[in-house]
């Protein structure tokens, strides 16, 4: 496929208009696959964030009064625009992020459109409630939009995470100031360009910045009624603290160290596919990646032998080539962090079964490519089994019994995803219920459709997205009590 045509320079999107940053500073966004400069983006200042928040509150005066039908029409129109521009948006995402075009075409972009359609349907089916609390008292329960929301998305799924956050905000009648990742701002900026005439001015504002300052301006700003963040647990704690200081809620989708559990009765081909899907999808840069691979002792040797063969066959290549199965890591710093963890694992006694090195031959020379990596002889107490690596590195851990693997799976600070592979439905349900995590897959991995609540427990976050329940997070309950009696209470003198 041909590379996408991009603007040389992108501005901030505030109040329905494209504007330079107030300090007129910019930063460059780099393609991780070849080191080329893709575009320059505006470096937002505190004043820019202020302006965006003011624009959002001004728009909220009108947007909060729109009907469900009007908001649903906007959501459906956005979905149609995404569909119409799928190839362009997919290529922008692959160029900016380094993930293979086959993934962005099949997952990131179409699933984003599906989320807008889903929430359009949700709000059209929502109803309030009324209760008669005795012959003279009627109670009405309504939900009203919470106001202006500050939203920050990560670099690993910049477009899809934008849909996860923006769709319920628009559906609920809220307005947003949206902060992209400094590493991958382009797909959201291109999206804003495509929908600028569909979403009313000020309802959706986009801020960009290359360092932590613009993000910190968001956290410190008193003008938000809610914060929403997807990213690392470390930064998530700062978001939670900022929200707590302002007495506002926060939705946090954070890190993970998920257990991918394989029992001896698993379907072999599905298991091999699920192993790779769990750790190689998006180069392992997935918060719910199946990075702890628990394999029952009776099939361990065969499992390892077959897994190594398949990992070594994975086509690592330039992300815009259709035959590429695994693309580039997000940048050199992340690549070096992953390689450092491989060395830590070796020092702890783990054995590198395959990969563990940079791929830099031929056209990969200028990029941040790694070989798919399996670590064997790992125990669950090693750092490589406890800390989030965020790369294509799976730690294979042997287990004997169901009780043992449940104990090890739950011996983690995180609780975001996980999977169990077995033909025994009773065992599948026992294990799925027994693992302390927000999402468990059975005989599949990394399925993330709309309509299914996704989020973590423990250090993996607070709240659920991709499901209608998130509408409750962006709205507040209001109760209207109506006295139907036609006489005074008699409690005080007439």
Outline where the language-model segments fall:
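Residue-level signal for inorganic ion chemistry
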Residues: 35, 71, 93, 116, ...
């Amino acid at each position: 496929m041909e590379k996408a045509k991009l603007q040389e320079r992108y501005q901030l999107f505030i109040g329905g208009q494209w504007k330079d940053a107030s300090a007129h500073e910019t930063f460059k966004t780099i393609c991780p696959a070849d080191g080329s400069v893709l575009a320059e983006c505006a470096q937002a200042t505190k004043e820019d964030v202020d302006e965006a928040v003011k624009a959002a509150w001004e728009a909220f005066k009108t947007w909060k009064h729109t009907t469900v039908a009007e908001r649903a029409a906007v959501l459906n129109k956005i979905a149609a625009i995404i569909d119409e521009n799928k190839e362009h948006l997919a290529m922008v995402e692959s160029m900016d992020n380094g993930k293979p075009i086959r993934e962005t075409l099949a997952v990131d972009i179409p699933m984003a459109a599906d989320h807008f359609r889903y929430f359009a349907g949700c709000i059209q089916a929502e109803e309030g409630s009324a209760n008669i609390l005795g012959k003279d008292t009627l109670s009405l329960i309504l939900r009203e939009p919470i106001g202006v929301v500050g939203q920050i998305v990560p670099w690993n799924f910049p477009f899809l995470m934008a849909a996860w956050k923006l769709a319920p905000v628009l559906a609920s009648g809220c307005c947003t100031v949206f902060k992209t990742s400094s590493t991958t701002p382009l797909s959201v900026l291109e999206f804003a360009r495509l929908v600028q005439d569909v979403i009313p001015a000020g309802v959706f504002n986009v801020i960009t910045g290359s360092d932590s300052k613009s993000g910190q301006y968001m956290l410190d700003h008193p003008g938000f009624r809610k914060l929403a963040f997807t990213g690392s647990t470390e930064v998530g704690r700062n978001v939670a603290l900022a929200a707590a200081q302002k007495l506002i809620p926060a939705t946090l989708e954070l890190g993970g160290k998920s257990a991918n559990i394989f029992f001896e009765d698993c379907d072999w081909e599905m298991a091999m596919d699920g192993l790779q899907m769990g750790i190689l999808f998006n180069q392992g840069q997935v918060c719910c990646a199946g990075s702890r691979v628990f394999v029952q002792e009776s099939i361990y040797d065969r499992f390892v032998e077959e897994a190594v063969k398949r990992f070594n066959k994975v086509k690592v290549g330039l992300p815009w080539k259709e035959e590429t199965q695994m693309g580039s890591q997000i940048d050199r710093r992340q690549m070096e962090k992953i390689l450092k963890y491989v060395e830590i694992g070796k020092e702890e006694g783990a054995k590198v079964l395959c990969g563990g090195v940079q791929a830099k031959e031929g056209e990969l020379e200028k990029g941040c490519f790694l070989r798919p990596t399996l670590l064997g002889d790992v125990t669950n107490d090693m750092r490589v089994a406890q800390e989030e690596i965020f790369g294509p590195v799976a730690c294979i851990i042997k287990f004997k019994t169901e009780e043992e693997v449940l104990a090890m799976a739950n011996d983690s600070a995180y609780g975001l995803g996980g999977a169990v592979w077995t033909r025994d439905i009773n065992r599948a349900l026992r294990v799925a219920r027994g693992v302390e995590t927000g999402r468990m897959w059975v005989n599949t991995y990394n399925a993330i459709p709309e309509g299914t609540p996704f989020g973590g427990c423990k250090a993996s976050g607070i709240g659920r997205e991709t499901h209608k329940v998130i509408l409750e997070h962006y709205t507040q309950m209001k109760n209207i009590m109506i006295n139907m009696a036609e006489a005074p209470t008699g409690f005080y003198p007439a």
